């Protein structure tokens, strides 16, 4: 289990009523990721999704379908199929040090079996307490909560809200 630093980390836990492979597929298939990665009604576009350690994770978003603006430019640090993804935006997809806005972070997504489907856990780590506080104030729980709900609905066989 990951050690949580409450001064610097934000967490979100859900049970998704779908098997782990369905949740994993929604994370690792570009056409599926685009359906839930940003809160509706914003639209996501997956520009690069190289699901391997060191692989690029690049997305854009649009409020009205055009133009798209950069959203995520990060790299995968850890990929354990059907169990764990870790990515950071502190290094961009070209492996250059980055100063992402609004905050630099490392996100760990963990999928475990649960009697009702998948135990889904997000841990987002920040460099210091101020960055954590800023991310929370900007709506971490609302934003990540909304996309997790959309992910769950997709993995459970529904459609995006």
Residue ranges and their predicted role:
Residues 7-13, 20, 44, 56, ...:
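Intrinsic-disorder/low-complexity, polar/charged segments enriched in Ser/Thr/Lys/Arg/Asp/Glu/Gln
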Residues 17, 79-81, 114:
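Structural motif
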Residues 23, 33, 57, 76, ...:
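Hydrophobic pocket/interface hotspot
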Residues 88, 95-142:
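Beta-strand/loop substructures that line and gate deep hydrophobic ligand-binding cavities in soluble
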């Amino acid at each position: 289990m990951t050690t949580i630093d409450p001064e610097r980390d934000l967490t979100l836990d859900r049970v998704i009523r779908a098997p782990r492979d369905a949740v994993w597929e929604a994370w690792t298939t570009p056409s599926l990721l685009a359906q839930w990665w940003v809160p509706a009604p914003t639209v996501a576009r997956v520009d690069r999704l190289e699901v391997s350690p060191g692989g690029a994770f690049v997305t854009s978003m649009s409020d009205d379908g055009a133009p798209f603006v950069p959203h995520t430019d990060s790299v995968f640090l850890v990929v354990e199929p059907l169990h764990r993804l870790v990515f950071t935006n502190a290094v961009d997809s070209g492996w250059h040090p980055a100063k992402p806005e609004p905050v630099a972070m490392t996100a760990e997504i963990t999928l475990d079996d649960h009697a009702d489907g998948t135990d889904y856990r997000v841990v987002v780590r920040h460099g210091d307490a101020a960055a954590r506080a800023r991310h929370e104030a900007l709506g971490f729980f609302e934003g990540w909560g909304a996309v997790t709900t959309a992910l769950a609905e997709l993995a459970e066989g529904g459609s995006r809200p």
